[in-house]
Amino acid sequence: MKYRKKPVVIEAVQFVDNEESILKLSELGLDPVRVDYADLDNPVLKIETLEGVMIATEGDYIIKGVQGEFYPCKPDIFLETYEEFELLNILDSI
C-alpha cells in the first residue's frame, strides 16, 4: 500500500551557532538550548527526545512536532519536505 503524509504545519528554526538562532530556538520552546563546543570548529546542538539525545549540526533545521517534541532534520531533507507556510497562504489567496 502507498501512503501520503497528512498536510501538517510545523514550526522550525535553522540551527546556526549565533545568538539570534539560539534565541529563536528558545522562543520555539526548546528548553534547555544545549550547544556543545567539545569541537570548537564544529559546535553541535544536543536535543533531548523520547529516544535519547539527538545531535544537530550547524545548518540543520530543528523542528517542533505536532505533540511539542523537537528533532533535527538535515537541510536537504527539510527543503524537499517542507515549504514556507506564509508564502503558501499568500499564493492560495490569489
Language-model region placement:
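N-terminal domain-onset segments
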Residues: 1-50
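Short, compact, well-ordered microdomains
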Residues: 51-94
